[in-house]
């Protein structure tokens, strides 16, 4: 389907056809798809034609959402990204007590014990650039998806990173400022009520965090070369600035 996607972006003027790529012919050549001719021996490139399934691929002139699939949410817990593209509209707003964890492993252990079988917002903190290098948190979605399928209203809040792994579960990710260094997530406690709303751009808690001390970060994991990158973690910028030590040192 990539040929169709590139083609519709070019048709709507949302991409430049003449940019140079690793392939001959510029970006426009990516709007064609490979195949074989009738005898099955010769590679040919052809126009992909219209979408074969409008539930999966649509032209840019008739998008799934006219205003895109990302939302900025912000409030007393900081600023975060909410990927709304695969989340049902009735789940754009979640308000529930939270459970606070410092690792993916702890979340899945609590899920296995049945401790998350309720309406809950799972907070996974100390996953930001300076805490542990902001790894991909791909192990969270299966458990949260199961809880959602059981009828519970669940969501995720984290200063960690996810790409497309959030899927159908409401998730406020890349939260900044991160918990390490005293960000708001470090002051949350179990059962604090959190509200996430992609429609209004809200990420807040009813708890008064002003008088609380931030939780201590867990000791960093060691081995597999992590020690070599400690200096980069210590000097990294926040997620909104690129989460990069090199860019930070260059003042970019």
What are these model-derived regions, one by one?
Residues 1-153, 157-178, 183-252:
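Catalytic or ion-coupling anion/metal-binding cores of large enzyme and transporter domains
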């Amino acid at each position: 389907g990539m040929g169709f996607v590139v083609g519709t972006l070019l048709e709507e003027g949302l991409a430049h056809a003449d940019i140079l790529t690793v392939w001959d012919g510029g970006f426009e050549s990516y709007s064609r798809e490979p195949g074989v001719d009738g005898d099955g021996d010769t590679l040919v490139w052809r126009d992909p034609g219209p979408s074969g399934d409008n539930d999966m691929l649509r032209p840019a002139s008739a998008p799934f959402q006219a205003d895109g699939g990302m939302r900025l949410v912000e409030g007393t817990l900081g600023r975060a990204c909410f990927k709304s593209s695969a989340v049902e509209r009735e789940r754009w707003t979640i308000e529930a007590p939270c459970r606070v964890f410092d690792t993916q492993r702890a979340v899945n252990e609590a899920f296995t014990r049945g401790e998350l079988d309720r309406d809950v917002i799972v907070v996974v903190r100390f996953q930001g650039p300076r805490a542990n290098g902001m790894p991909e948190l791909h192990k969270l979605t299966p458990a949260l998806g199961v809880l959602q399928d059981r009828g519970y209203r669940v969501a995720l809040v984290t200063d960690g990173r996810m790409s497309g792994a959030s899927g159908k579960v409401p998730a406020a990710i890349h939260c900044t400022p991160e918990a390490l260094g005293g960000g708001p997530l470090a002051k949350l406690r179990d059962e604090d009520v959190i509200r996430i709303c992609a429609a209004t751009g809200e990420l807040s808690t009813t708890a008064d965090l002003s008088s609380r001390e931030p939780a201590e970060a867990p000791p960093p994991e060691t081995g597999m070369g992590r020690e070599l990158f400690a200096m980069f973690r210590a000097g990294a910028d926040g997620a909104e600035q690129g989460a990069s030590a090199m860019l930070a040192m260059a003042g970019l």
